[in-house]
């Protein structure tokens, strides 16, 4: 989201519907910036089925596996005239693609990652890419060249410099300043970062807390005598979100039980 992948905001979280922001982006990018808010992912699925979208280019996301209602997602992808998937594995989504563009892992490219504590960290290439694969930035740059938009060769440091020029809270970030531990945005022009974002007040002001009355599920109350246990899934530390990057390792089947339930059934 920092880099503008949301349909209503550009890089730096500026609203794209604002004329002032449209002018800002147009001047920075050298092309006329879109003036309308784009579609969210679920809306894109519906639009694909309605033939309102002809093609989608997906980079590094296995939507068939991670998004709800997989059948609906598959129908949407099969409704497209062109589906381009840029991936490091032949994912469930990639299997539906018209064209697969083989990318590289984080060990095979230079750049930066930003984690959920706003920490921007350097990524240094450890090994060269496998034959036939390219870093994501190189693929995007090559595609721009093919489409007639001349670009210099992809350079991670130049991309970071462009980000720092456009995104205010990246202003003081350079590859050299990131060091081994990185910096937490917002980063001032002198390189000073921000360890704690909200110390005195929230940027957008106070919010309103909404409460909802809890109600027992009728499915449980009507069937709890015959089915006394509830099976639910959860997240674990080792698997990020839907485990698209980790589920290729051997599975370990684990079932967690409350001690009281286990004791009732003599489970030890």
What are these regions (language model features)?
Residues 102-104, 108, 120-129:
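Short beta-alpha connecting loops at secondary-structure transitions
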Residues 132-182:
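Long, C-terminal catalytic modules of enzymes
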Residues 258-261, 265-267:
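Single conserved hydrophobic/aromatic residue that forms the stacking wall/gate
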